[in-house]
Amino acid sequence: MKKNLIVLKNFKHHDDMSEETLCFSADVWIGGYKAGYAKNGGYGGQTDIHGYDAKGRELLKFASNQIGAMPPEIIEYMGRTLTINSTLENFIDKLTEEMIQEKENKRISNWIKKKLPTGIIAKNGDEYHYFPFLSRNTPEGRQMIINVAKREYPNCEILNKF
């Protein structure tokens, strides 16, 4: 089933309440119809999905059957091969993870845009480090700060373009 046929709206992620699974709530829209809602308390249980009305329950059942007919996902985890069945719950959980990652990427992008004019940004793996110009916003000063960043994080990538 195409992802754009199933959309989560009114999405709320509660990171502070996420323990073993993601704690969230969202309306589930199928084919432009507000079919129901999904929620997970974040305690390690499965995602609960409920229809708002008879048509919503029918659409959720149809979506569940369509997704259930899809091949399972095979992943490698800690040296083992795992088979994850295609279910509506797993599909919605994956949408949730993508939405959270998209939000985090946007947050990082905005932070970088804000900080670039005032300092050097060094990316080291998944981490970002900020080195302010202070009074060294000259070509020599910038190079000095880049050298400090490279000394502290030898494999880092400098995101500034001069």
Where in the sequence are the language-model features?
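Terminal leader/tail segments of proteins
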Residues: 1-162
